[in-house]
Amino acid sequence: MPTIKQLIRNTRQPMRNVTKSPALRGCPQRRGTCTRVYTITPKKPNSALRKVARVRLTSGFEITAYIPGIGHNLQEHSVVLVRGGRVKDLPGVRYHIVRGTLDAVGVKDRQQGRSKYGVKKPK
């Protein structure tokens, strides 16, 4: 607990909030180019081959982004839109690729939760 004299000498510093997605630089999404598309395994107790992409963003950052949904068409040099949002069982993956925009097509035959996977309403 500081004394009044100490508080006069230097005031309390406001708490700085640390962003969970620094590579986006305060933007809701960022465009980037895939440099590598590959699979990684989640941490215990889960088991799978999760699809991820290494993306070089327009902000200059090189990040690892998760590719949601079943099946994708991404390869090296694909241009993608990246949003924030981590994947809990993949350490170091703090971003998601937005499906249905730029080079990332929507998930095929998706009926429910279509808006999250870039799928138009079926006729």
Swiss-Prot record:
GO terms for molecular function: rRNA binding; structural constituent of ribosome. Keywords: Chloroplast, Plastid, Ribonucleoprotein, Ribosomal protein, RNA-binding, rRNA-binding. One of its GO terms (cellular component) is chloroplast. Gene3D superfamilies: Nucleic acid-binding proteins. GO terms for biological process: translation. Pfam families: Ribosom_S12_S23. Its main location: plastid. The keyword 4Fe-4S does not apply. PANTHER family: 30S RIBOSOMAL PROTEIN S12 FAMILY MEMBER (PTHR11652). Part of the 30S ribosomal subunit. NCBIfam families: rpsL_bact. Belongs to the universal ribosomal protein uS12 family. This is Small ribosomal subunit protein uS12cz/uS12cy.
